[in-house]
Amino acid sequence: MAQVINTNSLSLLTQNNLNKSQSSLSSAIERLSSGLRINSAKDDAAGQAIANRFTSNIKGLTQASRNANDGISIAQTTEGALNEINNNLQRVRELSVQATNGTNSDSDLKSIQDEIQQRLEEIDRVSNQTQFNGVKVLSQDNQMKIQVGANDGETITIDLQKIDVKSLGLDGFNVNGPKEATVGDLKSSFKNVTGYDTYAVGANKYRVDVNSGAVVTDTTAPTVPDKVYVNAANGQLTTDDAENNTAVDLFKTTKSTAGTAEAKAIAGAIKGGKEGDTFDYKGVTFTIDTKTGNDGNGKVSTTINGEKVTLTVADITAGAANVDAATLQSSKNVYTSVVNGQFTFDDKTKNESAKLSDLEANNAVKGESKITVNGAEYTANAAGDKVTLAGKTMFIDKTASGVSTLINEDAAAAKKSTANPLASIDSALSKVDAVRSSLGAIQNRFDSAITNLGNTVTNLNSARSRIEDADYATEVSNMSKAQILQQAGTSVLAQANQVPQNVLSLLR
């Protein structure tokens, strides 16, 4: 080997080896400090790509597990609302069973129907207001896809159905609808009439008031029997007193001499009393609200059928000398029953279609019966259990004020009782049960999906760890080796750097 000064080959070789051991030491320290075998693509290009795909799957599956838990929450929210709907349906069914019992009065049936209506409205409220994260879960049909995988198409569908009164087939559910009219139902109270028709029974004439718009003449109220009957055999009217030949005449108080008598009586009470005093007249207690002068003018009020009625007496001079029917004015449509003299009024039903006034079946026999009221001919069948008008079956309905009225089958269709109420409720319960069962099954499916996702994430983490995580035993060994090589290399480099000094010995 030539003895040279300019190039120290041994030193260069030692430096190169020292750099290699330095690189190994740096790599080992980096892996030990990060815990990763692959800290950059240069550490393992293929391994880095594989580990990165595992990371994508792990993150996607972890989020999918959270999505599945959200799916369980949606199903639980919906099922909870359906449970409350089910409770309301069970109560409606219980009430329907009660309503089908023949011992119920009209008042009982109305109370039952009122509660049923409230329960049905609550079902609609629950349907409309139940939501999860702003999504209404029962107000419309909807298929909600829940992503339960890390890739496209990996979903579970929650089938949400619209559940309300209409979708359950309970729209118009009624256990207290109008019933078919019978001859015995052809009656209404005096308070519903303003006009009259005239009927002949033998040589006698009977007037029965209906809403005909005819002017009621100022006639003295006659003495009448308690009831007027329609004979099922021939449709003729008769009274319960065969020898009574007095005409039946119903009248409005302010258009008759009876109204004059009432005006005088009320004016006299006002004249003899003071504001705030009370007095009784024909079974009704009146209060003097206003007294004008000393001639009997003023206002009195009372409560009839649950509403306040004010009667005004005006334009009286010189005592009660000029009192007549027109003197007494009412804030409501006040009528007087010619049977018992009691005051009645009804503001809502006075303009309804023609009604028979206080007619009652009596001794129904074979044969079809007919009666004409204000030009409308009502026909009762031979048994008296069905009444028709213009070929359409008539039904008895009750107004909001409790007055029985006649309506035809077209109007009754919208109000009629549900044909098979218990079957309708059972059908609704079955639909709710089916939806609840579906939601229960989907919750179990989500539970299974979450378990599987957890297992998959665990296995993928293990696989990724084997690729990119550092083996500390190996790396510590590599670091120790590199450290020793560094120490040795440094020492040898010092020796190599001294080799050129040997050339000086040749110059001595």
From Swiss-Prot:
Subcellular location: Secreted; Bacterial flagellum
Highest taxon of source: Bacteria
UniProt KW keywords: Bacterial flagellum, Secreted
One GO CC term, this protein: extracellular region
Single Gene Ontology MF annotation: structural molecule activity
InterPro entries per record: Flagellin, Flagellin_C, Flagellin_C_sub2, Flagellin_N
Keyword Transport set for record: no
Any one Pfam family match given in the protein's UniProt record, by short name: Flagellin_C
Main location (coarse class): secreted
Keyword check for DNA repair: no
Family from the record: Belongs to the bacterial flagellin family.
Function: Flagellin is the subunit protein which polymerizes to form the filaments of bacterial flagella.
Note: Individual Salmonella serotypes usually alternate between the production of 2 antigenic forms of flagella, termed phase 1 and phase 2, each specified by separate structural genes.
Name of the protein in question: Flagellin
